[in-house]
């Protein structure tokens, strides 16, 4: 299965969602480790591990003949169940941008790998090309029930297959309002639980994933993989 996680703006929780999905899918899989492709460079911080030191997606894109299998091989093992591929040259201060053709090639590679294992791409606020979304099994837009976030999300929501809603207290809008605004179903709703932020701050998500984070996403993954 190939999932892309993205958002209309930074700071809404996309990397946390992608990291939790990767761990959950990897632990449940009998087909080898899950892969997270980390375009924003924040997945290691969420998992509490070192940054990948080898080549990443940027180097893979820079080689026109590189295969999908070679993309998988540059992943850094985080656990027996999870590998992380960094952005590589894309993460440099003046790093390369991904062209529409690059997005499509990258998407085809992820779709190929997703036939045998689980691939999660953390695109953050980097807006993938339409062809990339179309190649994914699930395109999950991370959003909050906040006017500013929803306003930015509306023009982009047509690319999403569903919404992961981070539910913050104090907002008057609920799940139904978000679905009506974006025209897509809310597939998982994550609470703003202090246990989640504390685990991230302490670098313990990889060792002890908070139930408040895993439980809502596990319901989605069990349906998505048909288990």
Would you name each region that the model predicts?
Residues 2, 34-36, 84, 186-189:
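Conserved beta-strand scaffold positions in the cores of enzyme catalytic domains, especially
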Residues 2-40, 113:
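Walker A/P-loop phosphate-binding motif and the immediately C-terminal alpha-helix
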Residues 27-30, 60, 90, 144, ...:
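Cytoplasmic membrane-interface segments at the C-terminal ends of transmembrane helices
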Residues 32-114, 196-201:
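P-loop/Walker-type NTP enzyme "switch/lid" segment
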Residues 50-55, 179-181, 204-209:
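Short, hinge-like loop/turn segments at secondary-structure boundaries
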Residues 57, 198-219:
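C-terminal boundary of histidine-terminating zinc-finger modules
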Residues 107-199:
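Conserved catalytic-core segment of NTP-binding enzymes
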Residues 217-227:
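Conserved GTPase G-domain substructure that encodes guanine base recognition and part of the catalytic core
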């Amino acid at each position: 299965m190939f999932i892309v996680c993205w958002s209309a703006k930074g700071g809404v929780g996309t990397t946390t969602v992608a990291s939790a999905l990767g761990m959950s899918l990897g632990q449940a899989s009998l087909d080898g480790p899950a892969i997270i492709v980390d375009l924003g460079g924040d997945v290691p911080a969420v998992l509490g591990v070192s940054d990948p030191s080898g080549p990443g997606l940027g180097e893979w894109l820079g080689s026109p003949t590189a295969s999908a299998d070679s993309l998988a091989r540059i992943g850094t093992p985080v656990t027996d169940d999870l590998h992380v591929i960094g952005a590589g040259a894309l993460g440099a201060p003046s790093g390369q941008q991904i062209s529409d053709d690059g997005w499509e090639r990258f998407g085809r590679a992820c779709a190929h790998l997703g036939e045998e294992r689980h691939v999660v791409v953390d695109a953050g606020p980097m807006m993938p090309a339409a062809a990339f979304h179309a190649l994914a099994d699930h395109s999950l837009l991370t959003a909050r029930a906040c006017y500013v976030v929803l306003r930015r999300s509306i023009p982009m929501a047509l690319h999403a297959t569903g919404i992961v809603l981070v539910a913050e207290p104090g907002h008057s809008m609920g799940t139904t309002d978000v679905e009506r605004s974006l025209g897509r179903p809310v597939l998982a709703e994550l609470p703003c639980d202090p246990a989640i932020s504390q685990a991230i701050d302490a670098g313990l998500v990889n060792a002890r994933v908070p139930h408040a984070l895993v439980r809502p996403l596990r319901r989605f993954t069990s349906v998505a993989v048909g288990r």
